[in-house]
Amino acid sequence: MIKESELILNPDGSIYHINLRPEQVADTIILVGDPNRVPRVSAYFDNIEFSTQKREFCTHTGSYKGKRLTVISTGIGPDNIDIVINELDALVNIDLHTRQPKEQLTSLNIVRFGTSGSLQADIPVDSFVLSSHGLGMDNMFHSYKDSPKVREIAMEEAFIAHTSWNPLKGRPYIIACGQELKKRLLTDKVFEGITGTAPGFYGPQGRVLRLPVQDPDLNDKLHSFNHNGHRMTNLEMETSAIYGLSKLLGHQAVSLNAIIANSPTGTFTKDTKKVVEDLIVYGLEQLAK
């Protein structure tokens, strides 16, 4: 039996942070960062059967063209992803009454609809990127004993050597996306590559306001990294954590990002709302097929 201090439930039986009960979650889940983006996704649903919000975790469950979907906001960063993925898995794979893992496990399809900055000049603003891999520059995933079983160790070693990575920042980890789900979401409209996941927005992504960064050349090193044809395409704050936890728990996960900025060209989208809407429509259509 899982202890009450480990699997925390609210008085209504919902799981602690995301405030959901098992029947309120679809098998296909869309993750967004911003709670305000949840209604922008569910606005396309045929119906909304359930909605709730607790802190930054806003959820709508409904259907799109007959496909039952849940969209949930995660907030920002790998730490929040740790909460959301673990609690979603608990809802489908742990009996909340007996506090025992189920014998028959459910594999979720988890898709992130995000925004990101491009690291390559040929991936312009207003385009879409599917993350073939997530490259984590945080340390969250190393908390889990079995993380080496799902990591791309050779690619990690190549990245560490290429960047002369400072070991004080912890070892980067690389996880591939869910291959079955990727087949449904990758078309000729979408670029593909490695997505870097930073543990912060400023220093960890090379931004300098008043504090100097440890490696001012990091973004140039990210831009030039290529391992067996896999290159870095974009930088954000969630994908590697989604991929790592999903793979350990037996779920399929893919991250789709709308590119709103391009570092090499110094350009920024003229219409963030439109490119996000375009990504939402694209993702929903592919999931409904």
Residue ranges and their predicted role:
Residues A154-H227:
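Active-site rim beta-loop-alpha module in soluble metabolic enzymes
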Residues N262-K289:
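His/Asp/Glu-rich mid-to-C-terminal helical/loop segments that flank catalytic regions of hydrolases
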Residues N19-P22, P199-Q205, E277-Q286:
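Intrinsically disordered, low-complexity segments enriched in small residues
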Residues L31, P35-V38, T74-I81, I85, ...:
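Generic structural signal for well-ordered, non-membrane alpha-helical segments
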Residues G117, G134, G196-G203, A241, ...:
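Glycine-rich beta-alpha junction loops
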Residues M1-Y173:
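Metabolite-binding pocket within alpha/beta catalytic cores that recognizes anionic/polar moieties
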Residues S240-D271:
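Zn-dependent metallopeptidase/amidohydrolase metal-coordination segment
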